[in-house]
Amino acid sequence: RIVAELRAKGIEIEIVSGDREDAVAEVARAVGISIWKSGQRPDQKIARIEELKKRGRHPLMVGDGLNDAPALAAGHASISPSSAADISQTMADAVFQGEALAPVVETLDVSRSTQRRALENFAIAIGYNVVFVPLAMLGHVTPLIAAIAMSASSIAVTANALRVGLEWQGRTRA
């Protein structure tokens, strides 16, 4: 289910594992992942991440083992379950509770929502600067009106940023 959700969001998924070929092949087949590599050392995992970065990708590394720690550090972003080795948790950008991968989808959704809000906030700030600063400079609005508009734009930016938290508050995934 998680793999299907990620694919629906346009995410390409690969397994790059240090485990045996038969085990990796079985997991990949069970979850529907066609690109996988087994028997990978930490340096090989890093090489794959670097290759993806050179192609303009932003790889998210998900790992839990000792040998995943260097690759977690190399990923554009990385997450690890709370059951992971301590070094993997330390090297990951975020740690999620449990072992199920549902938080990967939620993390992606929250990050995309945050990015949208940031772009909206830039638009609000630019809009203020394009409209009210020239009007104030030309004397078409009083300093009081310009100050009120500046405060209103700051409040609008803050309120818009708070929408991310409100959007995700109370949501849980099964």
Where are each of the predicted segments found?
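Short active-site-adjacent structural elements
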Residues: 89, 104, 134-135, 158
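Membrane-helix cytosolic exit motif
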Residues: 150, 154-174
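Hydrophobic alpha-helical segments of membrane proteins
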Residues: 122-134
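Alpha-helical transmembrane segments of integral membrane proteins
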Residues: 120, 124, 145-146
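Conserved ATP-binding TGD loop and adjacent catalytic N/P-domain core of P-type ATPases
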Residues: 1-120, 128, 174
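Membrane-water interface of transmembrane alpha-helices in multipass transporters/channels
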Residues: 138-152
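Short active-site segment of divalent metal-dependent hydrolases/proteases
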Residues: 67, 132, 156
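Structural signal for membrane-spanning alpha-helices in multi-pass inner-membrane proteins
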Residues: 132, 136-137, 161-164
